[in-house]
UniProtKB/Swiss-Prot annotation:
Involved in self-incompatibility. Pfam families: SCRL. It comes from Arabidopsis lyrata. The keyword Transmembrane helix does not apply. The gene is SCRa. The lineage of its organism: Eukaryota, Viridiplantae, Streptophyta, Embryophyta, Tracheophyta. One of its GO terms (cellular component) is extracellular region. This is Defensin-like protein a.
Length: 86
């Protein structure tokens, strides 16, 4: 009986330890998903594509861009997911 109890307790402790280590691995990675910028001009025609071109010039590769006209300038917000380690 003692042997089976010891086995069950050991199993529970090992399971908790493994799940804790996996949780710590997930926290090592960060994700940046928004890319924003202000540019001169208005959002005319296909402003979303213009935003994508403007933000691509910085070496990024954004997707799903949104153009809004604010304070006399084009405000671009794009999704740009990049995963990097700490």
């Amino acid at each position: 009986m003692r042997c089976s109890v010891l086995f069950v307790v050991s199993y529970v402790i090992m399971s908790l330890l493994i799940s804790h280590v996996q949780g710590m691995e997930d926290q090592k990675w960060k994700k940046v998903c928004n890319l924003e910028g202000n540019f001169p001009g208005r959002c005319v025609g296909n402003g979303d594509e213009q935003c994508k071109r403007d933000l691509t010039e910085d070496g990024n590769n954004p997707s799903k861009c949104r153009c809004r006209f604010r304070a006399g300038r084009r405000h671009c917000r794009c999704i740009y997911c990049e995963v990097f380690g700490m």
